[in-house]
Every structure is written in C-alpha cells, then in structure tokens.
Swiss-Prot record:
<dbReference type="GO" id="GO:0005524">
    <property type="term" value="F:ATP binding"/>
</dbReference>
<dbReference type="InterPro" id="IPR005177">
    <property type="entry name" value="Kinase-pyrophosphorylase"/>
</dbReference>
<comment type="similarity">
    <text>Belongs to the pyruvate, phosphate/water dikinase regulatory protein family. PDRP subfamily.</text>
</comment>
<dbReference type="GO" id="GO:0004674">
    <property type="term" value="F:protein serine/threonine kinase activity"/>
</dbReference>
<protein>
    <recommendedName>
        <fullName>Putative pyruvate, phosphate dikinase regulatory protein</fullName>
        <ecNumber>2.7.11.32</ecNumber>
        <ecNumber>2.7.4.27</ecNumber>
    </recommendedName>
</protein>
<keyword id="KW-0418">Kinase</keyword>
<keyword id="KW-0547">Nucleotide-binding</keyword>
<keyword id="KW-0723">Serine/threonine-protein kinase</keyword>
<dbReference type="Pfam" id="PF03618">
    <property type="entry name" value="Kinase-PPPase"/>
</dbReference>
<feature type="binding site">
    <location>
        <begin position="156"/>
        <end position="163"/>
    </location>
    <ligand>
        <name>ADP</name>
    </ligand>
</feature>
<dbReference type="InterPro" id="IPR026565">
    <property type="entry name" value="PPDK_reg"/>
</dbReference>
<dbReference type="GO" id="GO:0016776">
    <property type="term" value="F:phosphotransferase activity, phosphate group as acceptor"/>
</dbReference>
<dbReference type="GO" id="GO:0043531">
    <property type="term" value="F:ADP binding"/>
</dbReference>
<keyword id="KW-0808">Transferase</keyword>
<comment type="function">
    <text>Bifunctional serine/threonine kinase and phosphorylase involved in the regulation of the pyruvate, phosphate dikinase (PPDK) by catalyzing its phosphorylation/dephosphorylation.</text>
</comment>
C-alpha cells in the first residue's frame, strides 16, 4: 500500500484517501509551505476502501511520530479510522467530513458517500485538456523554444518511455515536455536555461531497453541488427546518457519494469516537494 520505508527520525503526514489522494496531497503540501523549517515527509495512501486497509495503515504508522489526514467519504469507514487512530493515540485531520456535513446541512440532502464521484463526473477538465495538448505539442523534442513553460521536462534515450509517461502525466494535469537524448546530437540550448530541478532523466536497464527497441523494429517491419538494438552499442549509449545526466545535475529515476502510474506519481511527488505551491506554473 505504501512505497516508502519510514525512519523514526522524521515526522510523517499520511494522506489516507478512498481515491487517489492527489488533491489532499497538494493541500497538505501547500499548507506546509507556511512551516519552512519543518522536517516532515508527506506520503499518499490511496484507495482505502475497507477496514482491513485502515488496520494495515495504522499498523504501519503506529510506531512513527505521525499524523493522518484523510478524505474518506464513506461515513462508517471514516469513523472507523478516527476511532482506531484514537486508540493508537494517532492524530487525525478530517479533510472531507466537515465539508460534507456543512453542505448536507445547507442543502438538506444526504450525500451519496460514494468514492470517486468527482473523477467519474469530471473525466476531462480544462486543466487536463491544456496539459495533454502541451504534452502533444512538446513530444520528442518539439518546440524547444517554449521549454520554460513546462512544469516537468523528461529526458531519456529512445524507447525509455518518455512519450507515454508524458501523456499520462498530462491526464494528471501536468504540463510535460520530453526530449530524446541521442549521443553525439546536441541538446536544445533552452534546456540549459530552465530550472534543472524540473528536469527528470529516465534510466532504464539494458535488457528492457533492448526488448523495447527490438519490438519497435518488428513493428516497423525491420529486423536488421544495427546500433539501435545491438547490445554493445546500447550499453555504451546508456553509459553515455548517465554521464550526461550527472554532468548536468539532472534528477534520475529508474523506470525499469515499473508501471507508468508508479513513475508518474514518483515524479509528481518529487516536483511538488521541491516547488510546493509553485509546482504548477500559472498560465
């Protein structure tokens, strides 16, 4: 459920949500900007739908100095979390319950208490459309003159997964550009002019990269072995790329055998942690 190992030396805030928890995560991160000297880590725990999942969460955090902020809309499960957390002396913040109660009183209508309704009824909003359009317009090194408008810039070798990751993050509402790294081919000058903290280099192991490239060749109807898919050349290409990323000071993440969703969440959390309320650029 959680993808981070927690050290007892840190204070933690866990975002427990029956959905993705993205909005709650941004709310907490934006609030933490007011506490610049705090040493605290925020972790999302999405898709909390059962009491056993609540128990698992509490078992993981009970020995850590932590706080649980939650956006659980199902009232019984929400109360279960609050009650069990109190038993473990864990502080909780209800980010959803008070809002639901006030609106229920105002409208004199009971809420449905069904998770994910907003996502179902607002599948595509303006922010998503804008972000997806941006990803399409800045795919594979296009429009380098407007890299400064990107919230995230992905750099990686051919077939490292830049395009699908850019598109997925566009659906999440992030404006992402991606630039291919080809040894011997100059990178755009504008890449040196942007905030390098927004540049994320994608590392991928050689076996998976070779597999992706061979599949690409087959889809194009070409099976001739050449530098694009020969192991020796690809090994050199990977080493050269990594040296370039290190020289430029780019952050690197390993996307080998990792679902796009996991890589996207990792990058989004990294950028949000670095830029807080300024993670998303204003139009």
């Amino acid at each position: 459920m959680m993808d981070q190992t927690v050290s007892n030396n840190f204070k933690m805030i866990y975002i427990a949500s029956c959905g993705e928890g993205i909005n709650a995560f941004h709310l907490v991160e934006s609030t933490l900007v007011q506490f610049p000297d705090s040493d605290i880590t925020v972790v999302k725990v999405p898709h909390i739908r059962t009491e056993s999942q609540v128990d698992h969460l509490l078992d993981r955090v009970k020995d850590v100095e932590s706080l649980i902020a939650h956006t659980i809309v199902e009232p019984n499960l929400r109360q279960y979390l609050v009650t069990k957390a109190e038993e473990h002396k864990i502080v909780t913040i209800d980010l959803m319950g008070q809002v639901l109660n006030k609106i229920e009183t105002f409208l004199s209508i009971r809420p449905l208490g069904k998770p994910g309704l907003y996502r179902e009824t607002h599948q595509v909003d303006l922010k998503q459309v804008t972000a997806i359009d941006f990803a399409l317009a800045h795919d594979d090194g296009l429009r380098p003159e407007s890299l400064d408008e990107a919230e995230i810039i992905l750099v990686g070798l051919s077939r490292a997964g830049k395009t699908p990751l850019s598109m997925y993050m566009g659906v999440m509402g992030w404006k992402v550009a991606n630039i291919p790294y080809v040894p011997g081919v100059p990178m755009p000058q504008t890449l040196d002019e942007v905030d390098r903290r927004r540049v994320i280099a994608l590392n991928i192991n050689i076996e998976q990269l070779l597999s992706h490239r061979k599949m690409r060749q087959e889809s194009l109807g070409t099976s001739d072995m050449h530098a694009y898919s020969r192991r020796q050349e690809v090994e050199v290409e990977v080493q050269t790329a990594q040296k370039y990323y290190i020289t430029k000071g780019f952050s690197m993440i390993d996307v080998s055998n990792k679902p796009i969703e996991t890589s996207a969440e990792e990058i989004a959390e990294m950028i949000t942690r670095r830029f807080k309320a300024q993670a998303h650029l204003k139009d």
